[in-house]
Amino acid sequence: MVKIGKLQFMWKDANSRTGNCPGLHRVTDGTEGYVVVGKSTDPGVRAMIAEIGDDETAVFVPANVLDRLRGQ
């Protein structure tokens, strides 16, 4: 489990109108990184990922959530 002290909301799925939507947060506690919020995937997706740890998970987010990072 990764411990994170502070997050800064960056943006959400461009097609979302309300809460409960995929989004991206920047870690702002001195650790460089991001937290991605997305929909849980089914076990079949997890099985397709070659290397995934027992303490890791796979989530789906629309491409527009992460594509915006290129413009940063």
Task: Please describe what each predicted stretch is.
Residues 6, 23, 65-68:
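Acidic/proline-rich low-complexity IDRs
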Residues 47-72:
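C-terminal structural segments of small proteins and small subunits
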